[in-house]
């Protein structure tokens, strides 16, 4: 437990001098002691500058910090509470409670910097995880123990989609969930807490928040805090769900920290260590022979450009990608998932079965053909198309509308009750549209319904 003194403060970067024979290691947690508002502030060592000086990043606001303050080295990285005591609680990056409900009362703490499971320890499964959302279950099915990314620009519905997934999976799935709010709005964190409380699953969820107003060091580490809690549940042999909103803010916090530490930026101004930082986080989100972590991560796409280095680096780590499109959202079709851009490794006849694979493929083929015909329709109109193409367009428009669905979490905005559609009903519905069974039903009947039976009922009512 060596002590040092603050020698320089530049925003969130703090240099601390220690005796030459007791210099802290990289990632060690240091604590400011003494009077004033900064008492108890935690710093994380990022670099050793030589001469006993270490460069650190503050995990809280550095307002009121000054040179000469005493700093104590804890001798280990930041550690956070793990285990069942964290369930139903809201914590910050350090694992301290921020829900005003008393101490966590944990029996064990884990350090947030841990090695990823070795190749021998990892396990993979082809078991599907039903989400109850038609477009996802059909075109980009999730695997239990897999990694899923929700990609989308600003305001196309990433958080709403994630909330619906939590609502459908966390309630139906009796396991435990960990929610890491990384650099997102405090209001959304608040909404999530009450959503979980009202639906009675709060005692199965641990929540870790490092929101937009926090310093970059805090936002950079909060994903690791949430992951550490999930790892503990996995190592106890449980199946755990990890929700991260938003991975892009994790990257952005890394960019801020990198700039503060004086590193030369790389492509588009991102940190040179972008791929490595992403790998450190993503490689730990994995399933072992003991238990599984199924993760759903929201990924903000800057300026709707999927080739931006941040989303592009994330793509490589995922088993399924759900791409949200602004064009589809502008048509009023929600969830605004692009069925032609979204992918899943599970969409294989050996995994999902031949029928599911053929229906998904058929849907994508019809939509792709419709996309190609749109230019001809815009210039020459529908009358110039062949009968086959007219039928393709008609079915494609029905499929487009049938891919929409009312959400439980959006009931308060839309006024229509949310629908959970089983995979069996989803396949039956789309198979019927492709085969021409519902050619006589107007396309409006397919908009914002659950199963195909509701669409038929809606059409009969309109007659």
UniProtKB/Swiss-Prot annotation:
Q: Where does it reside? A: Cell inner membrane
Keywords from the UniProt entry:
ATP synthesis, ATP-binding, Cell inner membrane, Cell membrane, CF(1), Hydrogen ion transport, Ion transport, Membrane, Nucleotide-binding, Translocase, Transport
Superkingdom of origin organism: Bacteria
Its catalytic activity? ATP + H2O + 4 H(+)(in) = ADP + phosphate + 5 H(+)(out)
Q: What is its EC number?
A: 7.1.2.2
The protein's matches in SUPFAM superfamilies, at most eight in alphabetical order, are given as: C-terminal domain of alpha and beta subunits of F1 ATP synthase, N-terminal domain of alpha and beta subunits of F1 ATP synthase, P-loop containing nucleoside triphosphate hydrolases
Question: What membrane topology does the UniProt entry give?
Answer: Peripheral membrane protein
- Ribonucleoprotein: is it a keyword of this entry? no
**UniProt key word Transport:** yes
Q: Which residues does UniProt assign to the signal peptide?
A: none
Q: What is its main location?
A: membrane
All disulfide bonds of the chain are none
Alphabetical GO CC annotations of the entry are:
plasma membrane; proton-transporting ATP synthase complex
What HAMAP family does the entry give? ATP_synth_beta_bact
Family per record: Belongs to the ATPase alpha/beta chains family.
Provide the assembly information: F-type ATPases have 2 components, CF(1) - the catalytic core - and CF(0) - the membrane proton channel. CF(1) has five subunits: alpha(3), beta(3), gamma(1), delta(1), epsilon(1). CF(0) has three main subunits: a(1), b(2) and c(9-12). The alpha and beta chains form an alternating ring which encloses part of the gamma chain. CF(1) is attached to CF(0) by a central stalk formed by the gamma and epsilon chains, while a peripheral stalk is formed by the delta and b chains.
| Protein name (Swiss-Prot/TrEMBL) | ATP synthase subunit beta
């Amino acid at each position: 437990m060596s002590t040092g003194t603050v020698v320089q403060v530049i925003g969130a970067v703090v240099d601390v001098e220690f005796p030459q024979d007791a210099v802290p290691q990289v990632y060690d947690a240091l604590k400011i002691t003494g009077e004033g508002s900064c008492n108890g502030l935690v710093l994380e060592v990022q670099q050793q500058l030589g001469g006993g000086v270490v460069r650190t990043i503050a995990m809280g606001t550095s307002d009121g910090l000054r040179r000469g303050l005493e700093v104590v080295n804890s001798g280990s990285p930041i550690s956070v509470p793990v285990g069942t005591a964290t369930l139903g609680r809201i914590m910050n990056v350090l694992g301290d409670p921020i829900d005003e409900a008393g101490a966590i009362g944990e029996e064990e703490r884990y350090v947030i910097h841990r090695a990823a499971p070795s190749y021998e320890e990892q396990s993979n499964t082809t078991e599907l995880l039903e989400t109850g959302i038609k477009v996802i279950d059909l075109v980009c099915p999730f695997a239990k123990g897999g990694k899923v990314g929700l990609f989308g620009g600003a305001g196309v519905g990433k958080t709403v989609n994630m909330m619906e997934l939590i609502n459908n999976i966390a309630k139906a799935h009796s396991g435990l969930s960990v929610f890491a709010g990384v650099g997102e709005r405090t209001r959304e964190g608040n909404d999530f807490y009450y959503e979980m409380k009202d639906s009675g699953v709060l005692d199965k969820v641990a929540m870790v928040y490092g929101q937009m107003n926090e310093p970059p060091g805090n936002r950079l580490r909060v994903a690791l805090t949430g992951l550490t809690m999930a790892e503990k549940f996995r190592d106890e042999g449980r199946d755990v769900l990890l929700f991260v909103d938003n991975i892009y803010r994790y990257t952005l916090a890394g960019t801020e920290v990198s700039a503060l530490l004086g590193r030369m930026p790389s492509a588009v101004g991102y940190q040179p260590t972008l791929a490595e930082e992403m790998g450190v986080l993503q490689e730990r989100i994995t399933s072992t022979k003991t238990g599984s972590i199924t993760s759903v991560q929201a990924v903000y796409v800057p300026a709707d450009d999927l080739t931006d280095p941040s989303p592009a680096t994330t793509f490589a780590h995922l088993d399924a990608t759900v791409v949200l499109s602004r064009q589809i959202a502008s048509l009023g079709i929600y969830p605004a998932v692009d069925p032609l851009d979204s992918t899943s490794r599970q969409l294989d006849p050996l995994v999902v079965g031949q029928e599911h694979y053929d229906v998904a493929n058929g849907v994508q083929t019809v939509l792709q053909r419709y996309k190609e015909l749109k230019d001809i329709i815009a210039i020459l109109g529908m009358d110039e198309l062949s009968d086959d193409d007219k039928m393709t367009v008609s079915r494609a428009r029905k499929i487009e509308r049938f891919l929409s669905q009312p959400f439980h979490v959006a009931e308060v905005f839309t006024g229509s009750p949310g629908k959970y559609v089983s995979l069996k009903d989803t396949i039956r519905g789309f198979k019927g549209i492709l085969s021409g069974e519902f050619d006589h039903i107007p396309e409006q009947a397919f908009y914002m319904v659950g199963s195909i039976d509701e669409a038929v009922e809606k059409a009969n009512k309109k007659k």
